[in-house]
Amino acid sequence: MLPFAEAPRSVCILRLSAIGDACHIVPVLRTMQQVWPATRFTWIIAKTESRLMRLIEGVEFIIVDKRAGLGAVAAVRRQLAGHTFDALLHMQVALRASLIALQVSAAVKVGFDRARARELQWLFTNAHIAARSREHVLDSFFGFPAALGIKERLLRWDIPLPHAAQEYARALVPDAQPTLLISPCSSHVQRNWRPERYAAVAEHAVRRHGMRVILSGGPSLLEQATGAAIVRAARVPLMNQIGRDTLPELLALLARAAVLLSPDSGPVHMATMVGTPVLGLYGATNPARSGPYLSQQWCVNAYGEAARRFRHREPEELPWTTKIETPGVMDLIQVEEVIAKLDELLRSRP
């Protein structure tokens, strides 16, 4: 059954969310497109993530509104009526995604190996990727084309950006002055750093390096409050764009920034897509698993200390997916460490 002896006619990718994981799908998709240029690709994706990913050419998108609950499953069934695929790549271990996988007609349904097929994912597939342990999420995703017979790995994240998004970014970053983009919030509050610490780094970036500093983020009340707190605490001018951009506009802005400062969040992986180095703040999560794929050396990594302090174990002793989302965990990251890492990063740039 696998690997395929020849290029399949059609492949369906099932990965709904989140934005960072969707970013990891892109090089996997680009690799398959290059190796199998005649293959038809369909991606079942959540509504929010589709706002960026649907810009990828040559892919059919089936968009899922997760707020619709079981109604979303029925909607996918209707959209897929008459579709048959040579393979389904079931790349999400949530039960919601597995219910959607049931609606896909495919000869081969590839899931994770048994050890990683949480939430009974193995019941919804008839093939699996090779068993591996303690690897980055992106590397685990490359196990799927490998199972189909593709040995190549193309680290290509290119997404064509609309002219309007590029103009938005150019208006904010119109010249060669280096820009520090701060995206201060993650999807989980315990991954977030204190506003006054972001402000201290912003002050250093402006005074020591002459940087422009822009805050970015979504429209949630927490993000808006965090942005306002950073602006109040900083004794230098900042541009607060939190809640004011779309995903394509954010990607265009990241492309014009010199550095992104952020905790474990979607923008970390968006920055990787456009080649912008990421100064990642990691205490609650392990950057070796979920950090910026091309900026591991620029992460301030307090995960080991967090494991010892809050779990009383060495990080190597914890299950690979362990998150230490405990109050105070991000306080382990000191301002001085982040400033030192920023200085080192900027010295390394041409």
Where on the chain are the PLM-derived regions?
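Catalytic machinery of carbohydrate-active enzymes
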Residues: 1-350
